[in-house]
Design a protein with these regions (language model features):
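Rossmann-fold NAD(P)-binding glycine/threonine-rich loop
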Residues: 90-102, 109-130, 141, 149
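Short glycine-/small-residue-rich Rossmann-like dinucleotide-binding loops
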Residues: 87-88, 219
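Glycine-rich phosphate-binding loop signature in dinucleotide/nucleotide-binding domains
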Residues: 75-79
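Glycine/charged-rich beta-loop-alpha catalytic/anionic-binding loops adjacent to active sites
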Residues: 80, 124-133, 233-240
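C-terminal substrate-binding/catalytic lobe of Rossmann-fold NAD(P)-dependent oxidoreductases
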Residues: 2-9, 14-74, 156-281
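Rossmann-like NAD(P)H-binding beta-loop-alpha module
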Residues: 142-154, 173
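N-terminal Rossmann-like NAD(P) cofactor-binding module of classical short-chain dehydrogenase/reductase
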Residues: 83-84
């Protein structure tokens, strides 16, 4: 059986390292190599491509520094492959463009994209299959459904606040997952998140306004990820919490997305498509 090749972008980061480690559990997948980039305004610095002797990439890439574009060119003989990208929004946009150039599917787990960024990635989805999700875990994606239903049945008289916690080196805030959870509530309540989201409160004008959704971020230690959604009424409080105890969960989700994507035609998908979860009403 032909194995599906996997290239990991952000291979030296927390998620990249975890994905590479977990890939060894999958006999039908082949880790081709890892690219790790630090994109500056006018310069790209990339770590050496991790090569495998059986692919004879080492004859070409030994001692070199490769971009994803160069890595895709070197592995052109491997027809069935997928890129998994956990870098930054700026690097991911470049990688999506390069994947589209070589007609290779890409899974993107980076966060912090603007609406224009998302539109750019969605346009690449007209050329290649793309999965983009702020969280690859089954639990979080199921939680989004639970939060939607909780908002539906509790009603607008229950105020909603979201608290997210991550390790001290996470660069963006709030997390992509917190935004996804807030969007679940906003969609159910038929409001625009951009108009009703409040990111932290400070000063003497912090009184809650109608339909607000508060989102708060904690950055400390090596917290893998914790999200708490609070629905507070006048006489009771409901708290729904998800705690990640291992990055393996996210890695396996990303790998599942890559396998699923390898059999898809062009299109712009999210993790809910991969998991077969119902879309919101």
């Amino acid at each position: 059986m032909e194995k599906t090749g996997i290239i990991v972008c952000g291979s030296q980061g927390r998620m990249g390292n975890t994905i590479i480690s977990v890939l060894s559990d999958y006999s039908d997948l082949l880790f081709i190599g890892g690219v790790d980039s630090n994109y500056a305004a006018d310069k790209t610095t990339v770590s050496p491509f991790k090569d495998l002797a059986e692919l004879e990439i080492n004859k070409v890439s030994a001692g070199k520094f490769l971009t994803l574009k160069e890595a895709l060119h070197l592995t052109a003989a491997i027809k069935k492959k997928v890129v998994i990208d956990f870098t930054s929004k700026s690097a991911s946009l470049i990688h999506a463009e390069e994947a589209a150039l070589y007609n290779v599917p890409i899974v993107i787990g980076s966060t912090g994209f603007s609406e224009n960024d998302l539109k750019t990635v969605e346009d690449y989805g007209k050329r290649i299959p793309i999965v983009l999700s702020g969280n690859m875990s089954l639990g979080i994606n199921v939680l989004m459904n639970i939060v939607y239903d909780a908002s539906k049945y509790l009603g607008i008289n229950y105020d909603c606040e979201i608290i997210e916690m991550h390790h001290k080196k996470k660069k963006d805030a709030p997390s992509g997952t917190a935004k996804m959870l807030a969007e679940s509530v906003a969609k159910q309540r038929h409001i625009e998140l951009a108009e009703k989201a409040v990111y932290g409160r400070c000063g003497d004008a912090a009184e809650r306004k109608k339909d607000e959704i508060g989102i708060f971020s904690v950055r400390a230690g090596d917290i893998i990820g914790e999200h708490k959604v609070i629905f507070a009424g006048n006489e009771e409080i409901i708290e729904i919490t998800h705690k990640a105890v291992s990055r393996n969960n996210f890695a396996r989700g990303a790998i599942k997305a890559a396998v699923w994507l390898s059999e898809k035609n062009k299109g712009f998908y999210d993790m809910r498509d991969v998991l077969g979860l119902n879309k919101y009403e």
